A protein has these predicted regions:
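Non-catalytic, solvent-exposed interaction/assembly segments
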Residues: 1-80
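Membrane-proximal low-complexity regions enriched in glycine and acidic/polar residues
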Residues: 68, 73-148
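Juxtamembrane amphipathic/hinge helix adjacent to a transmembrane helix
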Residues: 151-156
Length: 156
C-alpha cells in the first residue's frame, strides 16, 4: 500500500514543467538555427509564451515566489539561448531581453544559481522549481560559464 502511493506521487507531472513545456520546446528548437528573420516577432512570441506560462502555472496551483523564481529561470534560459546563436549575438536582444522586460534586470546568470541554492534548502517545498531548473541546465543553460565556477566551488 505505501509503495503504491509513493510510486503514484513520484509519477505526478511537475506543474511548472507542464506549464513551461511549449516555451522550453520553442527555445530548444532555436538553439541551432543559423538565421532568424524576425527577431522582434520571436521576442513577442516568447513574451506571449511567458504570459501563457504564468496563466497555466496558476491554473495548476502555482503562485507567489516559486512562480516568480520559475519565470526568472525561464527568462534567463531563453535570453541565453538566443544570445548564444549567431544571429542573437548580433542582435539587440540584450538591450531588450526577457529578463529586462519581466524583472527590470539585464543579467541573470548568477541569480539563476542563487535561486537554485535557495531552493535546495527546502527541496520538498521547491521540488517543482528544482526540476524546472534542472531541465534548463540539461537543455544547455550555463549562466554564461557561471556554472563552471559554481560547480568548482561545490567540489572544494
Amino acid at each position: 500500500l505505501g509503495m503504491g502511493s509513493s510510486v503514484t506521487a513520484s509519477a505526478q507531472i511537475n506543474p511548472l514543467i507542464a506549464a513551461a513545456s511549449p516555451l522550453l520546446f520553442r527555445a530548444a528548437a532555436i538553439r541551432n538555427t543559423a538565421t532568424q528573420d524576425d527577431i522582434y516577432g520571436l521576442r513577442g512570441e516568447f513574451v506571449s509564451e511567458l504570459t501563457a506560462f504564468d496563466h497555466r502555472a496558476r491554473a495548476l496551483g502555482e503562485d507567489g515566489e516559486l512562480l516568480s523564481d520559475a519565470r526568472y529561470a525561464l527568462c534567463t534560459f531563453v535570453d541565453e539561448t538566443v544570445l548564444n546563436t549567431p544571429w542573437g549575438s548580433q542582435s539587440k536582444w540584450q538591450e531588450d531581453s526577457l529578463l529586462s522586460t519581466f524583472f527590470n534586470e539585464t543579467w541573470g546568470g548568477d541569480r539563476f544559481f542563487v535561486i537554485l541554492d535557495r531552493a535546495k534548502q527546502q527541496p520538498g517545498r521547491n521540488l517543482a522549481l528544482l526540476e524546472l531548473q534542472f531541465v534548463c541546465l540539461m537543455l544547455g543553460f550555463e549562466g554564461n560559464n557561471y556554472v563552471l565556477e559554481w560547480c568548482r566551488s561545490r567540489l572544494d
